[in-house]
Amino acid sequence: MVNSGSSANLLLLQSLKNLKKIKTGDKIGFSALTWSTNLMPIMQLGFEPVPVDINLKTLNISPRNLIASLKKDKIKCLFLNNVLGFSDDIMAISKICKKKNILLIEDNCESLGSEFKGKKLGTFGFASTHSFYVGHHISSIEGGSVSTNDAKLSDMLKISRAHGWLRNINSNKRKSYIKKFKINKFYENYTFFDLGFNLRPTEINGFIGFHQLSYLNQIITNRYKNFKLFDKASNLNNAFNRLDLRNMNFISNFTYPVMCKTQNLFQEYTKKFKKDKIEIRPLIACLLYTSDA
């Protein structure tokens, strides 16, 4: 656990860099429709960001989009954002990455609990990140996490989460580091072994988040029920584009996207929503990588 989903993204990339899975200057692909802190750590840590276009019917990178992007840019890593609780054919994307020797990691901050063909989003890549900010599937007020089944990455995440020291890894691994680098026992608690930050959560954030895990299934089930209601109503209106989510067998969405077919319809419905005091916002965020900044 870390202090935010944004920190989870930063920590994951730094830990992969520490392990030499990726290096400064490597090209990292990311979804053209994403949150700012899926992109920003890529830039901040010295990688080259490569936006990959999305399929408007799924709002996510499709295998076709990825293949088209690979013809122009040879990426070392794909930081795939599972947008708003959905995915395209992530199984096919995983196979492409494996074939091309591309490291696949997932930003699953908007999709906790969603399943593609019976497999949870967030379990297709080498690691995945989650956010527990207010409004997400579970909330610890502020918080996030990184998940992986790789022991070396797990240790490095714990090291880099807390300054670069060893205090949070198990004693046997800690001893092996101390022996390898010949660290004097007096200094071992204050020796920093790799690049890191202080991204630790507070005890109260951890307590609140842990408590909500006991009814996570209830939360995501209710989200799926709500999604079906919104989707049914939206599909009755010819002004909106329909989503194609046939391969999603469980949808734990973050919000419901309404996509108008024309700019005029967009302006019309924006006014209607505001008049009826219904909160609306962009699907995620503006296209930051096109900004002069």
Regions from the PLM with identified roles:
Residues 1-27, 41-43, 51:
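Phosphate-binding glycine-rich loop
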Residues 5-6, 64, 68, 77-81, ...:
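PLP-dependent aminotransferase class I/II
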Residues 32, 51-55:
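Short beta->alpha connector loops at strand-helix junctions that form conserved
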Residues 33-39:
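Conserved coil-to-alpha-helix start sites within the AMP-binding
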Residues 41-42, 96, 204:
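Hydrophobic/aromatic ligand-binding patch that stacks against planar heteroaromatic rings
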Residues 46:
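Structured binding elements
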Residues 57-156:
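Active-site phosphate-binding strand-loop segment of PLP-dependent enzymes
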